């Protein structure tokens, strides 16, 4: 599971259709998280990503140090599904998306990640799965972090959230 985490002071996601645009998620501050799921991802990957999102210390404390977590500051998450995080553009000019999970699996783990974040006491807004969306945000810092749960499987130093 891959997540691009962007610290924001405000963000929204609109669904675009032939009938126009509709805002389906909006937050005042916290993280915009673009979430991609691959074939081998399971609930353990969702737990790892949700735990990291909830506890990453990238918000300033009283001394200006990045020492506070999303939970500490009462921030929100705008969670947006993003299968293109598994694009392979190594050859040719058209990326392959064969590493992205099938829609049913991806949706299940995407929704599970949202519920896990809510279980941490975090307010979560979401995009709409399998739709054309436009994400608007004001990136703060900027702070942008890439998580890949696969790294927990290949690096013995990485801490994995217990079952």
Curated annotation (Swiss-Prot):
GO terms for molecular function: D-tyrosyl-tRNA(Tyr) deacylase activity; Gly-tRNA(Ala) deacylase activity; Ser(Gly)-tRNA(Ala) hydrolase activity; tRNA binding. A motif (Gly-cisPro motif, important for rejection of L-amino acids) lies at residues 141-142. It is an enzyme of class 3 (hydrolase). CDD domains: Dtyr_deacylase (cd00563). Keywords: Cytoplasm, Hydrolase, RNA-binding, tRNA-binding. It is found in: Cytoplasm. InterPro entries: Daa-tRNA_deacyls_DTD, DTD-like_sf. One of its GO terms (cellular component) is cytoplasm. GO terms for biological process: D-amino acid catabolic process. Its EC number is 3.1.1.96. It catalyses: glycyl-tRNA(Ala) + H2O = tRNA(Ala) + glycine + H(+); a D-aminoacyl-tRNA + H2O = a tRNA + a D-alpha-amino acid + H(+). An aminoacyl-tRNA editing enzyme that deacylates mischarged D-aminoacyl-tRNAs. Also deacylates mischarged glycyl-tRNA(Ala), protecting cells against glycine mischarging by AlaRS. Acts via tRNA-based rather than protein-based catalysis; rejects L-amino acids rather than detecting D-amino acids in the active site. By recycling D-aminoacyl-tRNA to D-amino acids and free tRNA molecules, this enzyme counteracts the toxicity associated with the formation of D-aminoacyl-tRNA entities in vivo and helps enforce protein L-homochirality. Homodimer. Belongs to the DTD family. A Gly-cisPro motif from one monomer fits into the active site of the other monomer to allow specific chiral rejection of L-amino acids. This is D-aminoacyl-tRNA deacylase. The gene is dtd.
């Amino acid at each position: 599971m891959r997540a691009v985490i962007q610290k924001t002071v405000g963000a929204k996601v609109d669904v675009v259709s032939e009938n126009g645009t509709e805002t389906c998620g909006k937050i005042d501050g916290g993280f915009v998280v673009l979430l991609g799921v691959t074939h081998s991802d399971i609930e353990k990957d969702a737990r790892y990503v949700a735990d990291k999102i909830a506890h990453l210390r990238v918000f300033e404390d009283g001394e200006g140090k990045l020492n506070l977590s999303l939970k500490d500051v009462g921030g929100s998450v705008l969670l947006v599904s993003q299968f293109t995080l598994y694009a392979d553009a190594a050859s040719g000019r058209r990326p392959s998306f064969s590493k992205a999970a099938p829609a049913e699996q991806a949706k299940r783990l995407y929704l599970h990640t949202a519920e896990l974040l809510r279980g941490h006491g975090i307010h979560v807004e979401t995009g709409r799965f399998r739709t054309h969306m436009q994400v608007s945000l004001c990136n703060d810092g900027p702070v942008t972090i890439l998580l890949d749960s696969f790294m927990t499987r290949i690096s013995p130093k990485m801490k994995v959230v217990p079952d």
